[in-house]
Amino acid sequence: MLTYETWEENNVSFSEEDETKGALSVLSWAYKEYEGEIVYACSFGVEGMVLLHLINQVNPSAKVVFLDTNVHFQETYELIQKVRERFPSLNIIEKQPKLTLDEQAKLHGNKLWESNPNLCCKIRKILPLEESLANEKAWISGLRREQSETRKHTKFINQDHRFQSIKVCPLIHWTWKEVWRYVYKHSLPYNPLHDIGYPSIGCEKCTLPVGEGGDSRDGRWAGKVKTECGLHYQ
């Protein structure tokens, strides 16, 4: 088994010349390699809809974790229910932070997402994902190279130093248009916020719509240097 510790033995390669640009092959390999020790960390963005559909074909009982920060858009929570109905056999886990919003405010002040967004992300996303990955050998992410400068070198299989794990990214070669084409082709549910200028959807407090021609991550932590929550730093 390929693990974080045995990374030097990595000799896995995949063809990108199929209909899914390698995504199904990558997922088939991952679930065979790790069996029950892999989880998909899903934010329920539009890429997530594609991956959930593909994963359901490969492993209908796969584990899916959603990092419920308690400050997501209502549309996101409604979408999760639609996904549960569309893919009832998937094991979708809504992972909560240890601190409630009230407890966080007492410790760090109100609106931590404004005063210290990095700490807010650590409490409400990074630490919960660490807990979710504690007993896993690998995790799946919907990163695409096209999304931003920080993601353009992502590979199918990555040694993830942040979580000391293997990070599997099946959609790295997909374009934004290809993602949507797949969603429409298979009549997949998606977050209606995508239709009003939100290409990337995170917490309600830190996500704004993006103007035409903007980077897909421009609406995240707008006005700050920050463009990543910290889950994908190497």
UniProtKB/Swiss-Prot annotation:
One of its GO terms (biological process) is hydrogen sulfide biosynthetic process. The active site is at 229 (nucleophile). GO terms for cellular component: cytoplasm. Binds 1 [4Fe-4S] cluster per subunit. Its cofactor is [4Fe-4S] cluster. It holds the Pfam family PAPS_reduct. InterPro entries: APS_reductase (IPR011798), PAPS/APS_Rdtase (IPR004511), PAPS_reduct_dom (IPR002500), Rossmann-like_a/b/a_fold (IPR014729). It catalyses: [thioredoxin]-disulfide + sulfite + AMP + 2 H(+) = adenosine 5'-phosphosulfate + [thioredoxin]-dithiol. It is found in: Cytoplasm. Its EC number is 1.8.4.10. The keyword Iron-sulfur applies. The keyword Iron applies. SUPFAM superfamilies: Adenine nucleotide alpha hydrolases-like. [4Fe-4S] cluster binds at residues 120-121, 203, 206. Keywords: Cytoplasm, Iron, Iron-sulfur, Metal-binding, Oxidoreductase. Pathway: Sulfur metabolism; hydrogen sulfide biosynthesis; sulfite from sulfate. It is an enzyme of class 1 (oxidoreductase). Catalyzes the formation of sulfite from adenosine 5'-phosphosulfate (APS) using thioredoxin as an electron donor. Belongs to the PAPS reductase family. CysH subfamily. This is Adenosine 5'-phosphosulfate reductase. It comes from Bacillus cereus (strain ZK / E33L).
